[in-house]
Amino acid sequence: MSVEGILLTIGGYLSGSIPTGVILAKLFGTKDIRQEGSGNIGATNVYRVLGKGLGALTLVGDVLKGIIPVMLACTLAGDELWIAVVAFVTFLGHLFPVFLRFRGGKGVATALGIFLVIAPLMVPLAIISFVLVAMKWRYVSLGSLTASALMPIFLCVAGYPIVYVNLSLAMGCLIFYRHRGNIKRLREGSEKEISKA
């Protein structure tokens, strides 16, 4: 256990905990995004409530929360296990942020940032999967769930280290857990479609 690894892990959690959507909504939208729309702090809800601009900024911010600490881990730690630990804790920071009493987002954008660093060649496949499903069935949540489910398969087939495959499995399970309300609405036929956003 290295000092660098411990510091990177703490920094990753704090980075993941930064509530991008909440901050942007309060700065430019004068609203608490947690009290609007679906109540989620992520880019989709910010887009629906406050428009494309703030939605896009929230997406970028949440992706960067995943990129920066994992890139630092790759540079300073180098060890695949430490990189995976930092990545997972960063992801947990978004889901359970200390700054919001551990009530965070669903993790898709931050997961995207993480995999842009550790498996950049697999990200286009995940994005294509997301787009095809989301456009076909008109549900952002279904696209996100599909991409999350397929990422471990992509990594495994491409021969990535097992620690990264396991990381993607763990993150995927948590993404499904955080989308349990969406899954319920999808089954009931009451999930909000893209065209209605």
Question: Which residues are covered by each model-predicted region?
Answer:
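Nucleotide and nucleotide-moiety/phosphate-recognizing core
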Residues: 4, 8-9, 54-60, 65-98, ...
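Loop-to-transmembrane alpha-helix initiation sites
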Residues: 122-124, 140-147, 160-171
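Alpha-helical transmembrane segments of multi-pass membrane proteins
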Residues: 12-15, 90-94, 130-134, 155, ...
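Short, non-helical or kinked segments that cap or interrupt transmembrane helices
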Residues: 31-40, 100-112, 139-147
